[in-house]
Amino acid sequence: MSRRVPDVVGEYRHISVDLLDRDDCRVKLGTVAGITHIFFAAYVEKETSVASVPPNVDLLRNLLDTVEPLSPNLCHVNLMQGSKWYGNHLGPYQTPAREDDPRHMPPNFYYDQQDMVAARAAKKSWTWSAARPHGICGYAVGNPMNLGMLISVYATVSKALGLPLRHPGSAANANALYQVTDTKHLAKSVVWMSTTDACASE
């Protein structure tokens, strides 16, 4: 599901729904029963970290409020987070980052989402997990947050202008630790997380 109708036709049933709109969720998702696993990757960009918290929590809350009552066999909710959990948007942070590292000073909507899901799961029979990839490369229509696409565009423009392909940043930036995962590997990993008991509530 997504708010925007995808340009790509596939072997799936797409539901166009605005997760920020509780009524739209009830109308569009109110007939979808029997969901066992939720893979949540919705995101709303705002100008500040403070402003990002309410809408990003609402996206998830509206989904769960609608789907949970219709899905008594819900088993697992997976949250797609990212390295902002560790504070990469605030500057240098300890690497390698670990899941049990202390949280940075809020606000961070990942914290609010995870706390909400953990609190709900504690009262239910379903579990949750969180994936925190750094950079993601893969096919994503209309999504500029894709390092592979950005490098491809930069290389194409450089070639068209007759320029050599050079790193556009500083030496420190070029030598910084950065991890990238492919969307196919990421998809396999979250399916594994959502079906492996050892990953429950992690």
Predicted regions and their residues:
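Residues in the short beta-alpha loop(s) of Rossmann-like NAD(P)-binding domains
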Residues: 2-5, 83
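NAD(P)H-binding glycine-rich loop region in Rossmannoid oxidoreductase-like domains
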Residues: 6-62
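Short catalytic/ligand-binding loop motif for oxyanion handling, primarily in non-cytosolic enzymes
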Residues: 9, 47-49, 85-89, 138-140
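Conserved beta-strand scaffold positions in the cores of enzyme catalytic domains, especially
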Residues: 14, 128-130, 202
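Conserved Rossmann-fold NAD(P)-dependent oxidoreductase catalytic core, especially the SDR/UDP-sugar
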Residues: 36-40, 50-51, 55-109, 121, ...
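Glycine-rich "substrate-gating" loop/helix at the edge of Rossmann-like oxidoreductase active sites
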Residues: 102-105, 134-149, 168-183
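Conserved beta-loop-beta element that borders a ligand/cofactor-binding pocket
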Residues: 117-145
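Alpha-helical substrate-binding/gating segment
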Residues: 155-170, 176-202
